[in-house]
UniProtKB/Swiss-Prot annotation:
Gene name per UniProt: miaB
Residue ranges of domain Radical SAM core in the record: 148-384
SMART domains in the cross-refs: Elp3
Family listed: Belongs to the methylthiotransferase family. MiaB subfamily.
Record's protein name: tRNA-2-methylthio-N(6)-dimethylallyladenosine synthase
Family annotation (PROSITE patterns): MTTASE_N, MTTASE_RADICAL, RADICAL_SAM, TRAM
Record-annotated MTTase N-terminal domain positions: 1-116
InterPro entries given in the database record: Elp3/MiaA/NifB-like_rSAM, Methylthiotransferase, Methylthiotransferase_CS, Methylthiotransferase_N, Methylthiotransferase_N_sf, MiaB_methiolase, rSAM, rSAM_horseshoe
Binding site for [4Fe-4S] cluster 1: C10, C46, C79
Species name: Treponema pallidum (strain Nichols)
Ribosomal protein is among the record's keywords: no
Length: 456
C-alpha cells in the first residue's frame, strides 16, 4: 500500500501528519511519489484562515474527479474535518473518511479496513465539535512520536487546545479545551529522538505557557519545570543541543519561564510572543487579556534577562473597528520592539467566533493596504537585523546539501535564519553543529563560510 500527505496550516498539523505517517510505516506502507499515484491520500487541514479552507475545497474537487478514473482512498483530517464535517460529506461524497481532531484513535482501524480492501463507503465517527464544552478533552489522543525519517529536527506536541477564546480565533472550537501530555511520555519521546540522531526539538502547543502536565506521582508540572526536565534529559546523551517552543501567550509568560530561558543554554534564544495588535482598544475587543503596556513590559523583561534574545510575533491587521490611529499604534509598537520576524495577516471572519458578528468591518482595500505597510516595515527590520550578523561567527545546524548548489551545504542558526555554507564543504558535516562566519545576506538567507565544527 502507498500513501501521500498534503498538509496545510500550523506546525501542530505538520507534527500530527508525521505521527500518522509513523503508523503507516509501522504497517509496512510506503510513500508514493505524488497524490496522483497513491493508494491512500491523506489531507490534513487548517481552519484558521478562509484561504486555507478555500484551497482545500479546491483540492477535494480535483481529487473527487480523479476518483472517477481510478480507485483510491481519501482521508480528510484536521480542523476542517472537525468544523465542517457535514458540509464536506454532503459536498464531496467520494471522500472515504473524515477524521476530526478528537478522533485520532480511529486511524489504526481505518488503516486496517483499507488493508482489507473493504467496500468504499462513507465513514462517520462520533463528532465532538458541538459538545466539546461538556466533554472538553475526552476524545483527544497524543501520538507516540512525530519523528520524520532522516530528519535532524523534530516536533514534540506537549499540549493541545486553548482556553483563551480570543474573539477572532476558531482554534478553541476545533481543538477544544487545553489538555497537557504527561511528563514521562515527553521524556520518552526525547530519548527515542536522541537515538535516531535528532539534534533539535520544537515543543508545540496552541499555548505552551499554559502546559500543566503530570509526573508519575501525579504532581502538576509547569512549563518552566518541563523545560528544566528536558534540558537535564538532553544532557545525558548530549545529542539534542537546541530546544525551541511555540506558541506562547503573553498573559502566561512568567518570570520563572524568563529565568529558565536565561539560565539554560540549550533553550534557543528565540521567543515567539504573539502581540496581534498595538492598540489597547483593539486588544480588548480581541479578548487578549493584556494591554500594550503589559506586553512592552514583558518584552523589556526578556531583553534585560536574556542577552541577545530574538523575538518573533503575530500581527493581525484590519480587525473590526480598527481606526487609522489604532493601526499607527501597531506600527509604533513594531518600531519600538523591533521584532526579528513576524507572521502578518489581515483579519478573516470565522463563522462561530464572537468577532464574526462585530460591526464596523474594515473594507478589503483598507485591510490589504494596511497589511502591505506592516509587511514592508517588518521586512526592513528583519533585513537590518540580518545584516548586523555579517562578520560575526555563529553556530549553525547543518541540515542538507544546498538545493541550488550540491557542493554547498544548507542549515540554520539558533535564531532560525536560513544559512548557506559556501564553497566545497565536506558533506559529513550534515547533521552536525558548526561555527560559521557570515559573509553577506542574500534575500532572506545568510551566506557564510565554515570556521570549525563546534565542540561536542
Amino acid at each position: 500500500m502507498t500513501y501521500f500527505f498534503e498538509t496545510y496550516g500550523c506546525q501542530m498539523n505538520v507534527a500530527e501528519s508525521a505521527s500518522v505517517e509513523q503508523l503507516l510505516l509501522a504497517r509496512g506502507w510506503t510513500k508514493a511519489v505524488d497524490a496522483q499515484t497513491c493508494d491512500v491520500l491523506i489531507i490534513n487541514t487548517c481552519s484558521v484562515r478562509i484561504t486555507a479552507e478555500t484551497r482545500v475545497f479546491g483540492r477535494l474537487g480535483l481529487f473527487s474527479s480523479l476518483k472517477k478514473k481510478r480507485a483510491f482512498f481519501i482521508i480528510l483530517m484536521g480542523c476542517m474535518a472537525q468544523r465542517l464535517h457535514d458540509k464536506i460529506q454532503q459536498q464531496f461524497p467520494r471522500i472515504d473518511y473524515v477524521v476530526g481532531t478528537f478522533a485520532h484513535a480511529r486511524f489504526e482501524s481505518i488503516f486496517q479496513e483499507i488493508e482489507q480492501k473493504l467496500t468504499q463507503k462513507d465513514y462517520r465517527f462520533e463528532f465532538i465539535s458541538e459538545r466539546y464544552r461538556e466533554h472538553p478533552v475526552s476524545g483527544y489522543r497524543f501520538f507516540a512520536s512525530s519523528y520524520s525519517e532522516g530528519s535532524f529536527q523534530s516536533f514534540i506536541p506537549i499540549m493541545n487546545g486553548c482556553n483563551n477564546f480570543c474573539s477572532f480565533c476558531i482554534v478553541p472550537y476545533v481543538r477544544g479545551r487545553e489538555i497537557s501530555r504527561d511528563l514521562d511520555a515527553i521524556l520518552q519521546e526525547v530519548d527515542v529522538l536522541s537515538e535516531k540522531g535528532v539534534r533539535e526539538i520544537t515543543l508545540l502547543g496552541q499555548n505552551v505557557n499554559s502546559y500543566r502536565g503530570r509526573d508519575r506521582e501525579g504532581n502538576i508540572v509547569t512549563f518552566p519545570q518541563l523545560l528544566r526536565h528536558l534540558v537535564r534529559r538532553c544532557e545525558v546523551k548530549d545529542q539534542i543541543k537546541w530546544i525551541r517552543f511555540v506558541s506562547s501567550h503573553p498573559k502566561d509568560l512568567s518570570d520563572d519561564l524568563i529565568a529558565t530561558i536565561a539560565q539554560e543554554s540549550r533553550l534557543c534564544r528565540l521567543v515567539h510572543l504573539p502581540v496581534q495588535h498595538g492598540a489597547n482598544g483593539v486588544l480588548k475587543r480581541m479578548r487578549r487579556s493584556y494591554t500594550r503596556e503589559q506586553y512592552l513590559s514583558l518584552v523589556g523583561k526578556l531583553k534585560a534577562s536574556v542577552p541577545n534574545v530574538a523575538l518573533s510575533t503575530d500581527i493581525l491587521i484590519g480587525f473590526p473597528g480598527e481606526t487609522e490611529e489604532d493601526f499607527e499604534q501597531t506600527l509604533d509598537l513594531m518600531r519600538e520592539v523591533e521584532f526579528d520576524s513576524a507572521f502578518m495577516y489581515h483579519y478573516n471572519p470565522r463563522e462561530g467566533t464572537p468577532a464574526y458578528d462585530f460591526p464596523d468591518r474594515i473594507p478589503d482595500a483598507t485591510r490589504i493596504a494596511r497589511l502591505q505597510r506592516v509587511i514592508a516595515l517588518q521586512m526592513s527590520t528583519t533585513l537590518k537585523k540580518m545584516r548586523a550578523r555579517v562578520g560575526k561567527t555563529l553556530p549553525v545546524l547543518v541540515e542538507s546539501r544546498s538545493r541550488n548548489n550540491p557542493e554547498e551545504l544548507f542549515g540554520h542558526t539558533e535564531l532560525g535564519e536560513m544559512t548557506v555554507l559556501e564553497g566545497k564543504v565536506d558533506p559529513t558535516y550534515i547533521g552536525r553543529f558548526v561555527d560559521v562566519q557570515v559573509k553577506e545576506v542574500r534575500g532572506r538567507t545568510l551566506r557564510a563560510h565554515l570556521v570549525q565544527e563546534r565542540a561536542k
